[in-house]
Amino acid sequence: MPELGILGNHVILDLDSSGNLTWPGAIPKRLCWGVGADDRWHFSEERASIRQSVDSNEITTLTRMRVPGGDITQRVEVIPWGGQSVTKLEFYNETPIPVAISIMLLNFGPVEINSRTVSIDAKPVIASSKTPRMLINGLGYQDITDRIVNAELEDIRTSKLSTNSPSDDSALIFPLPHSTKLELLINNEDLDNLPDIERSPSFNDVSNGWQKHFESGMEIQTDDNRLTSVLNTARRHLLIGSDQEIASRFWNVDSDEPVVPLAALALMAWGHTDSAKKLIFKYMESAPTNLFKNSVDKETLYALCLWQKYLEFCSQEEELEDIILWINETVRQLLASLPVKRKLKKRDMTLEIVSLRAAIEILTFMQQKTLATELQNQLVKIEEVIGSKENPSPFEKYTDSYEISIETLGGYLQIQENSLTLDQILSKANPTGSLIMGSRQQDPVFSALFLLIIRAGFLQEKKLPSGEKQIQVASSYDLDWIGVGIQVKNAPISSGIMGYAIRWHGTSPALLWEANTSTRIQINAEKLDESWFSNDHIGETLLSKQIPKETAVSIHANTSLLKNRIRPDSPDGGTFQ
């Protein structure tokens, strides 16, 4: 039940668990549907006979309604058109008998039909692959469905178009013979024209486009479809969200978690730095300003810390000259807002101190060494007064520990467990990979936190006192992983990328890795072998033998997150990039 949209566009649709669509707005428009079968009309709001899953392309949501004789399937996507977007909706009749499809348009306004085009005020609203046989107008969902039920089904299947008095709510009735499909293109943005259905992108085209976006970032390959579905849905959700304004409904979440910074962190951690940069700019520019006193709000301080985090993942050649004026002004306001020395100890200065350190690192990166040195000297004086130099990053609990990050998500989901597992998190998501929170069909806080815990569970990066970067792989390993092959590709690390694969020789895991970075690194796999580490950028090793639980096979064989285990003698351990 994801929120649907495309990159580079502000339109987002809600798709609920029954396949109904909502266009949010001051007066939300809604599209519901029904099937006229041999026995009666079946409407999407009834829900009892409806199931949802992800299509075979691993992206598109597939909704099935059971009627006598088989299923009527629905697929829906938002597709690009002329720099904007339209919604593509398809119904397919898998039964051996003809049916009728009702498309209920609520709050759309009075419609007119001209062959296969439905218009409002002379502008096309819907283009269809078939001509509707009947137009029924009414007042609200219940009145519309009552009128549909009272219409003669045989007339709907055979008669010419008939209608009654126009109103803001209406229903289009289409015939749908067996093994045929009905395609609709719906106007999202008050466009003057709609594309030809025959020339519009297919659902597989849309899926391939999203897969290419995913492949530009970090990839994790396992044999568990649930994990794949939730990962794809979460990444797609935040990529779409990066084009939404900060004040939009998308980011309006009832949560104490900093939703926009979390989303930017997740996008960076998965290699989608362009989308993350775009989102940080919007967040930075949306921060409130106070013209009458020197003060810096929390959002601005978070933005400083996000830019510091961004430097870890961006190219060393990348220029950030367009934020230097903002950095200088923010630092000036931040220093001016600090209390006098005698009051420094009485106030929690953690976020301010961390933000100053972030500003120093950013200025150093941008070759503003004089400013960076001046700021460093002032920071030393402040730290001497408050008597502490240990100030954790505001994002530490989301990025630095798999155990802490999964506890954070568990708390957000109100899961009361002492030792939370990934299986328990995945069980909260529905078959489409999304998770309903309140009135939202998909929750951006969950999307961001989930991506961050999976990143931490498969690859973590920390800075050692020696200056080396420590990279820990397979932090989420437990004994249910014995015999399970995994593969990680294109994981962003400091000034580079890394990939690794684990394959098994009996109960001993073999680790293969390759890190493409100029930074000194130390790689370890503490959950698999506490004593092993390597400073090599490329290598392979056989880690210590794992001792399975005595009851592991009988209890966990069918419920493990990663079900399809690799035989010890199998050569198919996978490769990585």
Predicted region positions:
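Amphipathic, well-ordered alpha-helical segments in soluble domains
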Residues: 33-34, 59, 279, 299-306, ...
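Amphipathic alpha-helical scaffolding segments
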Residues: 108, 189, 278-286, 325-329, ...
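Substrate-binding groove/exosite segments of carbohydrate-active enzymes
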Residues: 160-166, 209-313, 317-320, 392-426
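Catalytic cores of carbohydrate-active enzymes
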Residues: 215, 221, 228-231, 264, ...
